[in-house]
């Protein structure tokens, strides 16, 4: 298993799989709790990524709607 950081899309897919598992109600309680905890952590990471992307986009756009130089990406 590599230490490569997963992309936003990969994490979102993992979260969707966890939600689907939990919605079926067919997994044991202990596993459901573990999956719920993983899902909450993924959700938090995804939210941070979205907030960071939003801040970057706000910095890029000038008040008049023109684009500024993108230094950080």
Curated annotation (Swiss-Prot):
InterPro entries linked to this entry: Exonuc_VII_S, Exonuc_VII_ssu_sf
Keywords annotated in UniProt: Cytoplasm, Exonuclease, Hydrolase, Nuclease
Gene3D superfamilies registered for this protein in UniProt: Exonuclease VII, small subunit
One Gene Ontology cellular component annotation held by this UniProt entry: exodeoxyribonuclease VII complex
Main location: cytoplasm
Localisation per UniProt entry: Cytoplasm
Molecular function terms from GO: exodeoxyribonuclease VII activity
Reactions performed catalytically: Exonucleolytic cleavage in either 5'- to 3'- or 3'- to 5'-direction to yield nucleoside 5'-phosphates
EC number(s) per entry: 3.1.11.6
GO biological process: one example: DNA catabolic process
Regions crossing the membrane: none
Superkingdom to which the source organism belongs: Bacteria
Subunit-structure text: Heterooligomer composed of large and small subunits.
HAMAP family membership: Exonuc_7_S (MF_00337)
NCBIfam families in the cross-refs: PRK00977.1-2, xseB
Family membership noted in the UniProt record: Belongs to the XseB family.
Purpose of the protein: Bidirectionally degrades single-stranded DNA into large acid-insoluble oligonucleotides, which are then degraded further into small acid-soluble oligonucleotides.
Protein's name in the database: Exodeoxyribonuclease 7 small subunit
Origin species: Streptococcus mutans serotype c (strain ATCC 700610 / UA159)
């Amino acid at each position: 298993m590599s230490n490569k950081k997963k992309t936003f899309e990969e994490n979102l897919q993992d979260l969707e799989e966890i939600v689907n598992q939990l919605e079926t109600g067919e997994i044991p309680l202990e596993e459901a709790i573990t999956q719920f905890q993983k899902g909450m952590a993924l959700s938090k990471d995804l939210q941070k990524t979205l907030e960071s992307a939003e801040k970057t986009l706000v910095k890029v756009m000038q008040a008049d709607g023109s684009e500024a130089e993108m230094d950080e990406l």
